[in-house]
Amino acid sequence: MNLQFNQSLAKSYKSASQIIRVLSEDWVSREGYCPNCGNQPLSEFANNQPVADFYCQSCAEQYELKSKKAKLSYIINDGAYATMMARIHSDNNPNFFFLTYSPEFIVNNFLIIPKHFFTADMIIERPPLPATARRAGWVGCNINLKKVPELGKVFLVKNQQPMPNEQVTEQFQKTLFLRNQKSLSRGWTLDMMRCVDKLPTHFNLQDAYRFADYLQLRYPNNNHIKDKIRQQLQILRDKGLIEFLGNGRYRKL
């Protein structure tokens, strides 16, 4: 995988944002592949496509690309707040590619957040633009990646090191079961994933119960939080994300 942008494409543009859009989209079209099925290359949508930037001709997964000249941060600028919220609740929201690059126009990090990891509480509403702005009153948003469990951060390139394709597709496909869950059930599973992220590789049921107060705040109408924790651990076990060792002991895989 060649991590260098083709800077010759920038000669026809003056706007920094246009240059980065052209260079990053060109790089993804040349070097990117579908994290779901491994198909390469990805195809580009027409420029006026409102939902996504790329799609896979083999499995039809769709991807939107966000690029940034900086280290990978937890807060990512996005577009209109109302549009983003509508997409999260729709059936055709795309997966998100996040790309960071160096001052030398080399890809530092390239990762995907699968669409089934996006929840409303990840989206931060920004203040409306002031009356003096060209788009006065427009409300944008940021994406808070801190809310994404580690399993939902699938790196294709990490610290300028390409990841094996097989590893990428395996991690992506491990969590596809979330797409078949209803919103509330998926929320529980994502919350449990975030809790497990904070535990050591080997943990026990009592360790998981430490999150009971946090989960009670998240789900105040649920009066059986510990039962729910056990249920969610069983789901993660059945999906091959953790291993049950017996006697209330678990191991993260």
Regions found by a protein language model. Give the residues of each.
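Short, positively charged loop/turn segments that connect secondary-structure elements
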Residues: D213-I229
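Charged low-complexity interaction tracts in eukaryotic proteins
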Residues: D227-L253
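Short, flexible, mixed-charge glycine/proline-rich loop motifs
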Residues: I20-E31, E44-P50
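Long, low-complexity, charged/polar intrinsically disordered regions in eukaryotic proteins
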Residues: I112-D191
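Short Cys/His-rich Zn2+-coordinating modules
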Residues: A10-V22, P35-L42
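Positively charged, polyanion-binding regions of nucleic-acid-associated proteins
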Residues: S183-F203, Q234
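Short metal-binding segments enriched for Cys and/or His
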Residues: A60-N95
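Short cysteine-rich clusters marking metal-coordination/redox-active sites
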Residues: C34-C37, C56-C59
